[in-house]
A protein has these predicted regions:
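Aromatic-rich, lipid-facing transmembrane alpha helices and their immediate juxtamembrane interface loops
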Residues: 1-154
Length: 154
């Protein structure tokens, strides 16, 4: 799919639902939802790309500017995914909403966050990935966790 392994769109599809459930609960407008949801999806990619490079799925000849601790991924890759994620989140936010129990998507989102930080740091020895991904996702995850615990929807 345009040089992207099919696993990536499948993973993003799996992640899109819990991200949208979380960001729709946090944001007041569709545009805010798109930016917050886009940030959360793209920051998750900070964990994915180093794994994909490590598995040999892709590499860049001209890295340009990179984040310290993530030397194999050019920053323009993150920016491209960020724009794609904002567009995707905006489009998904246009779909009709219906009331749904958010326990499963909430659990999935927390599990993905925690497991990616732990896996990057301890299993793959990628401390920079754990820090950048953990901080970037944490900018949304921690306020969202505060929101769901302080304002439960029953």
């Amino acid at each position: 799919l345009l040089g992207v392994p099919i696993l990536i769109p499948m993973a993003w599809s799996m992640m899109a639902y819990p991200v949208m459930m979380a960001t729709q609960r946090m944001a007041a407008t569709p545009l805010t939802t798109a930016f917050i949801g886009g940030w959360l999806l793209a920051s998750w990619d900070l964990f994915l790309d180093p794994m994909m490079v490590g598995e040999g799925y892709w590499r860049w000849n001209d890295l340009g500017w990179v984040l310290p601790g993530i030397p194999d991924i050019p920053m323009q890759n993150f920016l491209g995914w960020l724009l794609s994620a904002i567009f995707l989140a905006f489009a998904l936010n246009l779909l009709p909403r219906k009331a749904a129990n958010d326990t499963v998507p909430n659990t999935l989102l927390i599990w993905i966050y925690v497991s990616n930080v732990i896996a990057a740091a301890f299993f793959f020895g990628q401390i920079g990935v754990a820090l950048w991904g953990g901080i970037a996702m944490g900018l949304v995850i921690f306020p969202w966790i505060w929101r769901i615990w302080s304002q439960p929807q029953w």
